[in-house]
A protein has these predicted regions:
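Metal-dependent active-site segment of extracytoplasmic phospho-/sulfohydrolases and closely related
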Residues: 445-486, 562-571, 579, 587-589, ...
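Polar, surface-exposed loop/tail segments
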Residues: 193-196, 475, 543-547, 558-583, ...
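Short, strongly hydrophobic alpha-helical membrane anchors
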Residues: 1-10
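Histidine-centered active-site microenvironments of extracellular/periplasmic hydrolases
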Residues: 469-520, 575-629
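Active-site-proximal N-terminal segment of extracellular/periplasmic enzymes that hydrolyze or transfer
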Residues: 41-92, 101, 177, 664
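A short beta-strand-to-alpha-helix junction
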Residues: 163-166, 446, 494-519, 534-546, ...
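Short, structured active-site-proximal loop/turn typified by the sulfatase FGly-forming signature C/S-X-P-X-R
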Residues: 72-121, 125, 183, 493-494
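His/Asp/Glu-rich, glycine-adjacent segments
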Residues: 114-431, 514-563, 597
Length: 671
């Protein structure tokens, strides 16, 4: 999950449930009345649209983070037979990624065919130019604009306002304008869903019901008070019949978290446990995840919000401990729009049962915090993966023409948490048993290969298949705190007496600070006219950027004697577009084994520039892009030597006989 759970806050879900129901019923009736006319019109026009097409259908199977080095190694060892067959029948190439090498950036380039300065996504996090605080880069959720105040109560009138910060136009919307249908499943940076001629389920950066990017709850009989510093740590109180506690949900009208009480007891048989919540009893087996459990957070007559969680008993002695996933938005009754059309999420839930809707559904932070172990993390990742497979194969069946695009996240999340098993000397392995997990990555690659094989079996000769990843992977052993380096070199100034190791730039004297770092991508200049407390004048900006780049190029880690930063680039040298100034001014090309430190990401200033990364998150890709390309397999031969992820959008347009629009910078790669 994003460090510190950067999110829009809670309290955004109440008050709109009844309104949404009425709107949904009305919309459904209108659609039903219009359907025959639309069907005939689209059939006639759609037939015309496909006459110029070179293929009937394009399928994008996205395996986030699949690494070319490991793919090539396992293929050489004959361990990935389906990818080997796909390579032989069509082709394989390393796929040039983006800078920064982050999923939000890369998949936005995939969707739009444009560079970050045109689509406005430079990473997971941006920053407020008013407060310097980190912000979610992809979307913002605001409370309803109209509120009824009754004393201390604030009753929202209507649904929350959700703004998409990604700019430019994705290829599926352009295809839809020509009546070419697309089904888009869990492609990052699709929240909130945009209206187009097709179906879409949102992905990365879709919040949980509390408004965060994924805040778990952990219950223990050892806790005496609620602690919200990293996830939610909540006491589990003993009763005459077992234990009891509460689920803390979104904020209610009075500002406090709405609660759902629950009880936990050992079953009379002694073989399992029973969790009772919302008048339903759910069977729990220690060490095994529950099914999705529905929760209803009520504020009386003011409305309610529904969520779903999975629960895992992690210990029964000496303490009873319970892990609960972040509260996912219930797909059967979404509190926020998570699909287009809105009833598509409901349709999938009716078809296959409840499923994870959180953008970052695999709880990496719970493993970092050691509230779950490695096996529990793997179990969760593959449960989510199984849900995605059901959606994907349903889409293949229901979309015989047009585009099907689905991104699977397990490959990325598992490598983040288990890449360290390839390196016995990784700092995160100290004092931990890792030998049992040395085969996890190979097993994951074999599972992804099996998915590719089952996909190929379902395709006909008129379907163009791409299997791709947005980036590769490398080790993350050492963190680099750029804010500390800036401080030590006089570019970032602390107030007199300010303490170190604080997040969100606490203690920074902006009246004397010329540069700062936030997020994973790079550095910002504290500019006059852009930042609220900027001090660097327009005529001084370019010289300062080049000065910083020259000093940071080749930065050496004194403890290891290794080069930590290969090259620093001016973003203005790499990208052109209307949103250039929204991104970092300098992009940092880290070497293998290095990355921005955890503290630096959220605006912290540490005592030392370099530090060991001791978290389970021991693999990463936010480094120099030449070190972490993605992969591109196809059942047709790729005709260019250096394909980039931005090439796929214009290639899609071209394959359907359409001229790519001017904003797309890539080129067609298959005739």
């Amino acid at each position: 999950m994003l460090l510190a759970y950067i999110g829009p806050g809670a309290g955004f879900v109440l008050g709109g449930t009844f309104v949404a129901l009425i709107v949904g019923i009305f919309t459904g009736l209108v659609s039903l009345i219009r359907w025959p006319v639309r069907f005939i019109y689209r059939t006639l026009r759609g037939g015309k649209a496909y006459r110029e097409a070179k293929v009937k259908r394009i399928v994008y199977l996205g395996l986030d983070g699949l690494d070319p080095k490991l793919c090539e190694q396992f293929m050489a060892e004959d361990k990935l037979p389906n990818l080997q067959r796909l390579r032989a029948e069509g082709g394989y190439s390393r796929l040039r990624t983006t800078f920064p090498c982050l999923s939000p950036v890369a998949w936005s380039c995939f969707a739009t065919g444009a560079n970050p300065a045109k689509h406005n996504i430079f990473g997971f996090l941006s920053r407020s130019t008013k407060t310097y605080m980190p912000e979610l880069s992809s979307s913002v959720v605001r409370p309803p604009s109209r509120v009824l105040e009754i004393g201390k109560l604030e009753i929202p009138l209507g649904r929350p306002e959700v703004e998409m910060r990604r700019k430019s136009v994705p290829f599926w919307k352009l295809l839809g304008e020509h009546d070419i249908h697309s089904t888009i499943l869990r492609v990052p940076i699709t929240f909130p869903p945009e209206e187009f001629n097709g179906h879409l389920l949102s992905a990365m950066c879709t919040p949980d019901l509390r408004g965060t990017q994924g805040s778990f709850s952990f219950y223990s009989t050892a806790f005496t008070r609620v602690d919200e510093s990293q996830g939610m740590r909540i006491p589990l109180r003993k009763t005459e019949t077992g234990f009891e506690s509460k689920v803390l949900g979104p904020q209610g009208p009075e500002g406090d978290a709405l609660e759902v009480p629950f009880s936990l007891r050992r079953a009379k048989s002694g073989e399992h446990w029973e969790l009772e919540v919302d008048k339903r009893t759910h069977e729990l087996v220690p060490g095994k995840y529950s099914e999705w459990i529905p929760l209803r957070f009520s504020s009386g007559m003011l409305g309610s919000a529904k969520g779903i969680v999975r629960v895992l008993i992690t210990s029964t002695e000496p303490e009873v401990e319970l892990y609960m996933t972040p509260i996912n938005i219930d797909p059967e009754s979404p509190a926020l729009p998570i699909s287009y059309p809105e009833n598509y999420a409901v349709y999938l839930a009716k078809l296959m049962g409840s499923y994870s809707t959180l953008g970052l559904a695999e709880d990496t932070w719970a493993l970092n915090e050691r509230v779950i172990d490695e096996q529990a993390f793997l179990d969760q990742a593959y449960l989510n993966h199984g849900e995605r497979e059901q959606m994907f194969f349903n889409a293949l069946e229901k979309t015989p023409r047009g585009v099907v695009a689905c991104v699977f996240d397990a490959s990325d999340r598992i490598q983040h948490m288990f890449y360290r098993t390839l390196e016995p000397d990784h700092p995160a392995n100290r004092g931990r048993e890792t030998e049992a997990y040395t085969g996890v990555l190979e097993d994951m690659y074999k599972r992804m290969d099996d998915l590719v094989g089952r996909t190929m079996q379902r395709l006909d000769e008129d379907t163009l298949l791409f299997v791709l990843s947005d980036h590769g992977f490398e080790s993350f052993q050492r963190g680099v705190n750029l804010n500390t380096w800036l401080h030590q070199n006089g570019y970032l100034v602390m107030k007199e007496g300010a303490q170190f190791d604080q997040d969100f730039f606490r203690g920074v004297d902006w009246s004397k600070t010329r540069a700062y770092a936030v997020g994973l991508g790079g550095l910002y200049i504290n500019r006059v006219g852009r930042e609220s407390k900027g001090i660097v004048k327009r005529g001084e900006v370019d010289a300062l950027k080049r000065e910083l780049a020259a000093k940071l190029d080749g930065l050496v880690d004194p403890e290891r004697g290794a080069t930590a930063i290969i090259k620093v680039h001016l973003s203005s040298d790499l990208y052109k577009g209307p949103y250039l100034n929204a991104g970092p001014d300098l992009l940092i090309g880290y070497n293998k084994g290095y990355r921005a430190s955890w503290a630096s990401v959220t605006g912290g200033v540490s005592v030392e520039v370099f530090e060991d990364n001791s978290k389970a998150w021991g693999g990463d890709h936010c480094i120099d892009p030449d070190l972490v390309p993605g992969v591109l397999f196809s059942n047709k031969k790729v005709l260019v030597d250096d394909p980039g992820i931005e090439d796929l959008a214009p290639n899609t347009m071209s394959m359907f006989g359409l001229k790519p629009p001017r904003h797309m910078e890539g080129r067609p790669i298959i005739e």
